[in-house]
Amino acid sequence: MKKIYMVRHGRTYLNKYQRLQGWSDAPLTEEGIEGAHRMGKALKDQHFDLVASSDLKRAADTRKIIVSENDNWESTEMTQTADLRELFFGYYEAFHDTEGVAAAFKSTKYPRLVDAVKDGYTWQEIGDLFHAADPEGDAESGSEFESRLKRGIDYLVNHDESERILLVGHACVIHCLACIYGGKHLRTDLPKHNEMTVLNVDDNGQVSLEEFGRPMY
């Protein structure tokens, strides 16, 4: 049985400023760098056959910091894929969370995106709302987002003989994957930077959620 251990990238300046951060990128803050080092130390006694991330710089940088804390990972294979990028908010990239959500939902009911998630909005619905509201039509639809993530997980599942895989990902990505493979929408906070979520992959390639949001430090 394979397992995919998912952690979120370190905190960035766009996180700090409460901006929607999809395909737009920003450097890790000092807190984010320190958090990545702490995650690396928390994983010190773990063995992974593959360490992966999205191709966005904040995720790749976090992956490199985590690996730097583990000398015994020197021979571990590294990879990254665009299929596991964060949700693309299109025109609303880097908007303040409150402003972007108000524009997409055409309502001021939800101060933050996570409030809509906790109120029951699925990623299918959220993606579709941003896509419909985008004056340029660039934002991903919900089905595009979910299909892309499934493609990314298929890539990891079918990657050689790797049994234990560490994925450095993104908040919406990890939450969406937990909903897809957990079989229901999770009315929870988005994953924090210090938490781990685990997927199981059985011998038939079926993926399921083992645990969500376990604090690591």
Put a short name on every predicted segment.
Residues G40-D115:
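Phosphate-coordination/substrate-recognition cap region in phosphate-metabolizing enzymes
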Residues G35, M39, A59-T62, S141, ...:
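Alpha-helical packing segments of well-folded alpha/beta enzyme cores
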Residues K2, S68, L87-R112, D154-R164, ...:
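Acidic, low-complexity terminal tails and accessory targeting/binding regions
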Residues M1-F48, K64, N204-Y217:
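An N-terminal RHG(E/S)-centered segment typical of histidine phosphatases
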Residues S53-S54, S147, V168-G169:
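Short beta-strand scaffold positions
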Residues T108-E144:
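Short glycine/proline- and acidic residue-enriched helix-loop micro-motifs
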Residues P27, N72-T81, H185-N194:
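Short hydrophobic/aromatic-enriched beta-strand-loop microsegments
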